[in-house]
């Protein structure tokens, strides 16, 4: 996987397009959503094995701004994967806590536009990745995944991603020695209100 990641990073620097940005974020969301031991922290470590401290830069400067480029049918599964990254990766909650608010804000803006999961797949999904030989790696990961991976994020996140985010934040308190509150205080009120409603419904308190 490291050679694939390196090729992706070269493409991001040399000839980034909106199409490639969308597929790159989709790829990261897919990896973070894999229901396997050690994920999504393994995704962070994969990037950091290429260059120390790299994933924090990718999260803040690539994933966060490019989430908005996702088409409607790609939003649900990708958002669910990024929520896992925000709440189940020790590095995101500690080493890369500075990048956490920007990524959280982006995923919450995405949730405001995201309805129930759309299961239709069109033939051009992944075309830009395929041009670089990345689609083969994507397909390899998908075929090696569990049945839970294959049926999509709804099977493990449920149909309501706000509720899923709230529950995951409750669990994230065990990974972060400091309070989550300072991170959430950096989120604008218009999106934080929606999250607070979900926290109340799920009986989760962030102190």
Residue locations for each model-derived region?
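Alpha-solenoid helical-repeat scaffold
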Residues: 1-207
